[in-house]
Amino acid sequence: MKQFLDFLPLVVFFAFYKIYDIYAATAALIVATAIVLIYSWVRFRKVEKMALITFVLVVVFGGLTLFFHNDEFIKWKVTVIYALFAGALLVSQWVMKKPLIQRMLGKELTLPQPVWSKLNLAWAVFFILCGLANIYIAFWLPQNIWVNFKVFGLTALTLIFTLLSGIYIYRHMPQEDKS
C-alpha cells in the first residue's frame, strides 16, 4: 500500500501532463502529494521524513514553476531531491559514522559493517548519477522525453537498483538469516 501511495503523485503528474500540459501536471502533482501526505497522517498517524521533504520540495519548486510559468523549476526538483538523498547518505557515513541505510534497515538485517558502508555509498552514487542524468535530459532534450524519463526511466532504474541491492544484501547475510 505504501509503495502505491508513494507512486500515486507520479501517476497523476503523468496523466495530467498527457491530457493537459506541464503546468496542469505540476499543480496536480502538488495536490496529489498533499493528499497522500494527509492520508498517510490520518491512516498511519505518521509521516516519514523523506515524504515530508519531498512534499516541501514539490510545493516550493512546483509553486515556482506555476508562479513564473517556467518549467525549469519542476525539472530541477528531481535533481535537488536526489542531491539531498545522496548528501544525507554521505554525511551519515562520513560524519555520523553510521550509514543511513544501516539506520533504516539495521533492525531487520544483520550485515557486516563494510557491507553497510558499501551499500550506503552505492546508493549515494546512484542518486548522484540519477540527478546528473536528470539535468542532462531535462535541459538538453524535449520536455516530453524528460517527463517519460522522470516517470518511467527513473522508476525503472530505482527498481533495478533496489533489486541489485537486495541480491547484494542476500549474498552477505549470515547463513542463519537466509532461511
Curated annotation (Swiss-Prot):
Disruption phenotype: Deletion mutant is shorter than wild type and shows abnormal localization of ZipA, an essential protein of cell division. Deletion mutant is sensitive to low osmolarity. Disruption confers resistance to cellular contact-dependent growth inhibition (CDI) CdiA of E.coli strain 869, but not to a series of other CdiA toxins tested.
Membrane topology, from the record: Multi-pass membrane protein
Topological domain ranges for the Periplasmic compartment: 1-21, 71-75, 142-148
Coiled coil: none
GO cellular component: plasma membrane
Membrane-spanning ranges: 22-42, 50-70, 76-96, 121-141, 149-169
Source organism superkingdom: Bacteria
Keyword vocabulary terms for this entry: Cell inner membrane, Cell membrane, Membrane, Transmembrane, Transmembrane helix
Chief subcellular location: membrane
Cytoplasmic side: 43-49, 97-120, 170-179
InterPro entries (UniProt xref): YciB
Result when mutating residue 111 to V: In strain: ECOR 60
Protein localization: Cell inner membrane
Effect of residue 117 to L: In strain: ECOR 28
Pfam families: IspA (PF04279)
Lipid biosynthesis listed as a keyword: no
Protein role: Plays a role in cell envelope biogenesis, maintenance of cell envelope integrity and membrane homeostasis. Required for the normal cell elongation. May participate in the cell division process. Important for the septum site localization of the essential divisome protein ZipA. (Microbial infection) Probably transports the toxic C-terminal region of CdiA from E.coli strain 869 across the inner membrane to the cytoplasm, where CdiA degrades DNA. Toxin transport is strain-specific, mutations in this gene do not confer resistance to several other tested CdiA toxins.
NCBIfam families: ispZ, PRK00259.1-2, PRK00259.1-3, PRK00259.1-4
Family: Belongs to the YciB family.
Assembly, per entry: Interact with various proteins involved in cell elongation and cell division. Directly interacts with ZipA.
Name listed for the protein in its UniProt record: Inner membrane-spanning protein YciB
Organism: Escherichia coli (strain K12)
